[in-house]
A protein has these predicted regions:
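Short coil/turn segments at secondary-structure boundaries
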Residues: 23, 49-50, 74, 168-170, ...
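Short, conserved non-catalytic motifs in the polymerase core
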Residues: 33-47, 84-90, 99-121, 153-179, ...
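Short, residue-level hotspots on alpha-helical faces of the histone-fold
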Residues: 57, 61, 123, 127, ...
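Active-site palm subdomain of RNA-directed nucleic acid polymerases
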Residues: 191-203, 227-228
């Protein structure tokens, strides 16, 4: 856990000097720890309940709307691109090897969620816990059976700048249980096979081999050509 918290590449720096990594982890924790916030009136708040009110108020307004729009008419104009063959592929039951493959593709030391375990734990002890985890994931994917707390998350606030003061200087990040991430990864792997066929050629994200910077380069070249 100390290695995970320190965010240091152990393969390059070794793992013998534990005091060094403890100091790194402590420094990082102190830098990211939220001990105060500035409210909308510019007043510093150090009480935990006051900071909680600021966070709930800000993100509550951010992720809600006072003018909801009905998208049903808009969706009627969207032409379906998923063929019958694609649909048969998507609804085909998941199998155990897809669960194992999804776990192998996960970064070992991602921050843990409510389960308290990084993917490395499951990867290392798969011979022991693999059967139980596989059954849990397949029951969810194929039959919609989810155990209690399956999709619970821990929401942590990550600083967007070096010295955050306001709640706007933080972005929320959801930390999910590993089993839940395995299920979502398995679904994503299945979608990869049909995404190139249903996503526009002008969409430069989500499809393997396309870069989000491609559209930026196209826009730059277009403006350069117009200005000539």
């Amino acid at each position: 856990m100390c290695r995970q918290r320190s965010r240091i590449n152990w393969f390059q720096n070794g793992d013998r000097n534990t005091s060094f990594f403890h100091a790194k982890a402590s420094t990082r924790h102190k830098k990211n720890f939220m001990d105060s916030l500035v409210d909308d009136d510019g007043v510093w708040k150090i009480e935990e309940d006051k900071m909680e009110e600021i966070a709930i108020g800000y993100f509550g307004d951010l992720f809600s709307t006072s003018n909801p729009i009905d998208f049903s008419n808009l969706l009627l104009a969207v032409q379906p691109k998923v063929t019958q063959e694609m649909n048969e592929w998507l609804v085909w039951p998941f199998v155990a090897c897809e669960v194992t493959e999804a776990l192998k593709q996960m970064y070992p030391l991602k921050a843990p969620g409510p389960d308290g375990m990084p993917p490395l734990f499951f990867q290392h002890f798969w011979s022991t816990c693999g059967a139980v985890v596989t059954k849990m994931v397949l029951d969810f994917l194929n039959f919609g059976i989810s155990p209690c707390n399956f999709n619970e998350t821990h929401i942590t606030l990550v600083p967007k700048i070096k010295e955050p003061k306001k709640i706007t200087d933080y972005r929320p990040n959801s930390l999910c249980n590993v089993v839940y991430k395995i299920a979502s990864k398995a679904i994503a792997n299945g979608l990869k096979k049909i995404l190139p066929s249903i996503i526009s050629d002008t969409q430069s994200a989500f499809v393997h081999g396309r870069l989000i910077t491609d559209n930026v380069l196209v826009a730059f070249e277009t403006m350069h050509h117009i200005s000539q």
